[in-house]
């Protein structure tokens, strides 16, 4: 066990092999001794991984680009909170470079395959985190989610992907992809585990300009809740996905839900703005200095995505923002008639071969039902729904207004446990469902304390601070 005040020992190593014996490329950096600061706290005994765009003090943050890599001198806020809650960090995971992708193949550290069938993509950009959870290598993992990066790989690997309301978890110490819509996401085998992690990490952070003090909805959904589904769902010709979604709709009906067909036109157009308008300039802005100096160190098609961000004027950005605002207003008309949205997490699976043949088109398909969520300020939860006849997982995403995180979790757990699925790719049965307590955000005000003696991390009285919500900064 390594105390956070020591320099962590790390290695660059592979994860376990796939069923074909090929490496899974899920890890970029391993911490062989683990990193733990206390044996007390609500997450004591649990292990986790962090996507390699999230800072861990003394360990390189590569964002899957060696030329960009740096060694931070402090933990990201979310990592610090997890360590203070007793969790043990085992390493940092692979991702689509600069978190630009939804497929898990855009990394010089190797493509991460699907945990069920290595011929298929894992989904991304939180590919390594999803694989590590699905394979049972960690108890949970951190990802990020700008356009679906925490949901798509969850849906494709039979695990839970919790995309919280924007600003609910601090993004301080996270290398941004598009700062105004970035979220830290949680990947876990069960909804209860994901919520347990969320409880340990949520709360306003005055040092993060995009952190927010949110009023979280704690009233359960009605017994006969209304769930919106796309009036004309798109599966890109994947009949197995279409059948799996219909099965999931029946599963929600069995939980008391009433399906309501929803016009997705404003959501679909909003999704297109993320890459097909001047909003893509925010991705370029996130790495502008590096990209202007070393664009040749960025792999394709990430390089082309970032390059596209250089072509717009400030007027173009405003025009895109105005259009997004108009679409957000149109989308508001959906909510009086429903309590929650339900969509396929991904409309189809894609082979590694097909992704390499046409990486832009295939990636765009995977984001069909995810790209609009952060732009419209929604919360989302991807939960496993079934295993298709071809052996590949299918997941659905429950979407609600900002602050509906607990409501989504409560419904998501009921739905997930009714499926009879196992945990990820491990074959282990789901543990018994347990009540999910209403989420209580940390208060925004805090008292700064200098701590000495037995209250330091790893010492006997540190638990007294942790029990009162203290966070080491």
Task: Go through the PLM ranges and name each one.
Residues 1-71, 75-76, 98-101, 218, ...:
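Short, well-ordered alpha-helical
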Residues 29-34, 163-246, 266, 410-440:
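A short helix-breaking turn/cap at a secondary-structure junction
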Residues 43-65, 223-224, 278-332, 384-392:
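Short helix-loop capping/hinge segments that flank enzyme active sites or metal/cofactor-binding pockets
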Residues 48, 54-57, 68, 81, ...:
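Gly/Ser-rich, acidic/histidine-flanked active-site/gating loops
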Residues 62-69, 461-473:
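Short Gly/aromatic-enriched secondary-structure transition segments
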Residues 75-76, 80-201, 374-397:
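Short glycine/serine-rich loop segments
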Residues 84, 201, 312-445, 455-456:
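Glycine-rich, small-residue loops and helix-cap segments
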Residues 239-263, 287-293, 317-338:
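Acyltransferase
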